Amino acid sequence: MATPNLYWPVYKNLEKEFLKLADYIHISDDQTSIYSMHIADLIVRCSVEIEALSKELYSSLGGNMTPTDTNGDVRDLYFDTDCLDLLEQKWHISKKEITVSAINLYLTEEKHRLLLPRHKANKRGTSGSKWKQAYQAVKHDRRNSLKKATIENLLHAMGALYILNLYYKDERTDIGRVYLSDHNFDNRAGSEIFSAHCCHATCIAMAYHMDDSCISPPLGDELERSIYIIKYDDKSFREMHKNFCLDFQITEQRFNNSPEIAKFLSEHPEYKDKSINEICLAAGGDSLLMRIVCMQHSMGERSTRMEALLNKHSGIYPELLPPTTQGS
């Protein structure tokens, strides 16, 4: 029996309370420094959830639940320098980006709309993130630290909790068939305030040997910023590879048996190291290319599906080898 998710309902209730603020405050770029006791309370509640959830995720990653100090004595487990630091090592979580997308939040400046709420969250004191400094301040001295209980700090704390919840849920979402599909992934992922940054790994250079290096162009910084990866599901990826291999075998047979190609290469030996496509185009243009290159298996596929995968930096696609070496 699946373990019930106790964290998401709490997060959704915090979202509701935040959005109630927007009924009374016009939350725009020049209003983010507004502070109040109620906002302070929301920051504390939100941060308590962050502490609990970070420890859950730390445990799921095999973190040491009984750390020791320099003397070898068991010490408390710290949610930031222990738990969030491990999440940073595994998932690069400080670089994960979200967008404020609620229709009743009127934030137009990029610094208020595009958030990196986990940035420096694994640090302590003045080196840590501003929302975490605000949490510690209002928790221990609310009267003198109330000005730190701002909408901006609350929004960042909410964003940090949102990201942790997505990683805790660890959902793989079926987007549906590529062929004749009008479905898209809803990157709000259940939130009424935020949208998670996504990257697309669906532009692939087909080859006999397939893995993540076939994603073109390389995802680079987009992968670092992304919480979800839009990709072909593994079954479809394997089917695409199989169809490519079948088509390429036929293409090679046609190429090797073509009198036009043989004649051209005998007259132009400098082309022998070129690709099949380049040789065909030089020897006979588009018409020869269309007669040589086979696409019947690849073009006939109609069941290819896409999915949204949580980005854990653990690889996107399986490694696939040429048919002659599969399983050898």
Give residue spans per PLM region.
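Preference for solvent-exposed, low-hydrophobicity sequence contexts
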Residues: 216, 220-328
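Short helix/strand-capping turn motifs
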Residues: 179-225, 232-233, 238-241
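Alpha-helix boundary/N-cap detector
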Residues: 5, 9, 152, 256, ...
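Charged alpha-helical initiation segments
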Residues: 1-46, 52, 56
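Short non-catalytic regulatory patches outside canonical folded cores
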Residues: 51-133, 138-144
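Amphipathic, Lys/Arg-enriched alpha-helical patches that create a basic surface
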Residues: 151-199
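A generic secondary-structure signal for well-formed alpha-helical elements
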Residues: 50-61, 162-172
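Internal, well-ordered interaction modules that form the hydrophobic cores of assembly/scaffold domains
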Residues: 46, 127-171
